[in-house]
Structure formats: C-alpha cells, structure tokens
A protein has these predicted regions:
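Short aromatic/hydrophobic "clamp" motif used to bind/position activated sugar donors
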Residues: 79
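Conserved donor NDP-sugar-binding/catalytic core segment of glycosyltransferases
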Residues: 91-124
Length: 189
C-alpha cells in the first residue's frame, strides 16, 4: 500500500529513529517497503538501512533527482516521503491508512496528498506556530513528510532539481489537494 522514500547522506544518527517509527506500519501491513536513496554516505547510514531491511540505492545525484529516481522504483501505489530524523507519532499508521482508504473509495479525480502536523500533539507552542504559518499562507515544511498517490506524483513530474525540492513539489500539488493530518512529527537531530 505504501512505499516510504528517504533521501540520505551521512545520516546514521538521524535515520535510526525514523526507521524505528516505521516498524508499526510494516507490522500493520501498511508499509510495503522502505527505499533509502543515499548520496554516497561515508558513515554507517547504508549499513543501518541495509540491516533494517531497506532497499538501498546509491545515487550520486542532487536531492530532487535522487528522490524521483527512488520513487520510480517504488512498488506501492502510495508514497511517503520522509527526511532522516523525522519521527512520526504513534498514531500515524491508523490515520494514514484511513486517509488513503477514503481517497481511494471516493475515486476522486482530484487525488489528494497529505502532510503530517508539525510537532507533537499537545505542544502548544509548536501547534500555535504551525497554525499561524498556515493562516499566513506558508507551505508545510519538508519535516512534515508527504503522503501522495504515486499516480499524482508521476502526473506532477515528481521532484525536480531545484533548491527547495520538497516545497516545489508541494506547490505543484496545490493547497486544494493537500490535507493536513492530525498526526504530528517530531524532529530528531
């Protein structure tokens, strides 16, 4: 149902907590595979990803083309893009599955995408800042991840070779197709 794509480069310390948070999704049958698109790391990033059972692609490409190439190998019909160090809250599996099922049941020609809420639920300061950013028209941050139908991702042309590749993709998805999930993310550095 879901292929997770993570672009890494010397990310050994940040990758482990991100992968640990995905175990519940794999156990529940939501996560089909995790693809790590690595840019020739010199630390233990590749060893950690390999030991965790991830598909590791060694791609000496800029971030955008690396993400696009990794997404091109994905076998699931939905993609979840995460940055190393982003840890999803424990309720992410149920909410993500519900979001995907609702979109697929509606067979809406305007297939939607979703981002996770910035910060853990109950963190008043982070929630207030995220609401203020949204009210002022700011786009979600790359640390919020992105759940997107592979068909929509492909139709949009995927990630491009631009400076803020995640933000560029979100803008092409558009506000009307973008849903903000209640599940939060926690950034680990």
């Amino acid at each position: 149902m879901l292929s997770v794509v993570i672009a890494t480069q010397d990310s050994e310390r940040a990758l482990l907590p991100t992968l640990a948070a995905l175990v519940a999704g794999a156990a529940a049958g939501l996560v089909r595979e995790v693809i790590v698109a690595d840019a020739s790391s010199r630390d233990a990033t590749v060893a950690i990803a390999d030991e965790a059972g991830c598909c590791v692609l060694d791609l000496t490409l800029p971030r955008g083309p690396r993400l696009k190439a990794a997404a091109g190998t994905a076998r699931a019909s939905w993609l979840l893009f995460l940055r190393p160090g982003v840890v999803l809250e424990s309720n992410w599996v149920e909410e993500t599955r519900r979001f995907i099922e609702e979109v697929e049941l509606r067979k809406d020609p305007q297939v939607k995408a979703a981002v996770f809420r910035a910060g853990p639920l109950g963190s008043a300061t982070i929630e207030a800042l995220a609401l203020l950013r949204a009210a002022l028209g700011a786009w979600p941050d790359a640390s919020q991840g992105l759940v997107i139908a592979k068909s929509l991702y492909d139709a949009l042309g995927g990630h491009r070779d631009v400076q803020a590749t995640e933000r560029d993709l979100l803008r092409r998805v558009g506000r009307k197709r973008l849903v903000r999930l209640r599940t939060g993310t926690i950034g680990i550095t």
